[in-house]
């Protein structure tokens, strides 16, 4: 605990932000992070990760286990990620209501940093799914109009790997941030990848 306090004091003293609080909690990261965020009504949790290593590739990454322990939105940042601006945010909308969970945080960031949200969805030939996607896109666009956030709507063809399609769109449009809502119905959700 003493080492954690010393490290935290060192980080806070080197920060230019003055309205920071420090809290050190003892417990398992798989429970305590989410519990603390909910106790403090946190808007988001920002967590660094090194990626899955060794047996984590089989049993699930630590980051994924922490993420599924709470309903608080997460921002996962990997080592050497440099975030200087948040001008373009990519939101991937699906037919499920769960895919809309991240929109509150993303729209808050876009409003705060005067950014633009790119709302993308997969073109669907399933009529029921297409209607749900359209309804989610309309709902989100109404919200963004109301809070005066610039946005762009785009339906994309899926070329077999939707994740790669999203990343390609992000590269082509110079995205600064991806807002992705995660919901798993798998028994071992900690094995999921994002």
Predicted feature residues:
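Small/aliphatic-rich secondary-structure junction motif
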Residues: 1, 88-153, 175
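Structural beta-alpha unit
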Residues: 10-45, 146-194
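Structured loop/turn residues at secondary-structure junctions
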Residues: 25, 50-51, 94-95, 158
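Acidic (E/D-rich), amphipathic helical modules within compact regulatory domains
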Residues: 42-58
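Intrinsically disordered or low-complexity boundary/linker segments at protein termini
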Residues: 44, 49, 63-107, 112
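Short secondary-structure boundary segments
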Residues: 49, 121, 181-183
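Short glycine-rich, flexible loops that bind phosphorylated cofactors or substrates
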Residues: 53-54, 98, 186-188
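Charged helix-capping and loop-helix junction motifs
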Residues: 59-62, 133-137, 190-194
């Amino acid at each position: 605990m003493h080492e954690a306090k010393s490290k935290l004091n060192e980080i806070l003293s080197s920060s230019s932000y003055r309205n920071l609080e420090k809290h050190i909690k003892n417990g398992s990261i798989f429970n305590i992070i989410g519990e603390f965020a909910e106790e403090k009504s946190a808007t988001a949790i920002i967590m660094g990760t090194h990626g899955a290593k060794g047996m984590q590739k089989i049993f699930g990454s630590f980051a994924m286990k922490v993420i599924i322990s709470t309903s608080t939105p997460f921002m996962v940042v990997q080592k050497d990620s440099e975030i200087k601006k948040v001008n373009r945010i990519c939101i991937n909308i699906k037919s499920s209501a769960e895919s809309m969970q991240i929109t509150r945080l993303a729209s808050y960031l876009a409003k705060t940093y005067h950014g633009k949200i790119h709302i993308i969805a997969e073109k669907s030939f399933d009529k029921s799914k297409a209607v749900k996607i359209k309804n989610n896109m309309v709902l989100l666009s109404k919200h963004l109009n109301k809070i005066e956030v610039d946005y762009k709507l785009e339906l994309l063809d899926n070329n077999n790997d939707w994740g790669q399609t999203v990343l390609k769109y992000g590269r082509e449009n110079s995205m600064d941030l991806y807002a992705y809502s995660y919901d798993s119905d798998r028994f071992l959700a900690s094995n999921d990848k994002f």
